[in-house]
Amino acid sequence: MSGIAAAHNISLAALEAANPQVTNPDLINPGEVLNLTGGTRAPGGPQTGPSPKGAISMGAVTYGRYTGGGDVSAWTTRACETMDLPPAHWVGGYITLCARESSGNPNAINTSDSNAHGPIQSDGHPLHCSRGVAQCIPDTFSSNHVAETSTDIYDPVANIAASMRYVMRRYGVSSDGHDLAVLVQQADPNRPPHGY
């Protein structure tokens, strides 16, 4: 559905919301009719976030531990600066999201969910474990990596920047982040936690 959304200048989240009958957004069956009028246009056209410049291969992801200082507010602001995005709406949403995902710990690793499988990496944990302050899996981190950020998944600025690019692509969050809490429940302090 992402290609259809882009072709019709509609956010993916809006297209999915307008088509609850579609059970697998990666597979549209012949004869299946989509509702294109129920969606809302993605601000600025079909691309709702930065270009994919910066994506890296899975083999380029590194697994060092973060030893610097800072907090989620500062890291999110830096991610916004790197991506040339206004931080006003992103910071509050990511304070909530990161508190729920990792308690704000840039070295957090989830070894107990369904992603925790694959070959052991240099940090001693399976490849697909969620890692870092925004709990990115390496697949998501590498495909949404932002140029000019670290390739280390534990670097909080790089982790948050990749997560921001992911939510813009996956959920259609606008580049100014004004709709982050609406489209990503995990970033909304007024709704219960929900994975993203």
What is the predicted function of each stretch?
Residues 36-65:
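Intrinsically disordered, low-complexity Ser/Thr-rich linker and spacer segments
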Residues 12, 16-26, 57-196:
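Peptidoglycan cell-wall recognition and remodeling modules
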Residues 3-46:
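Extracellular LysM carbohydrate-binding repeats and other cell-envelope/extracellular binding modules
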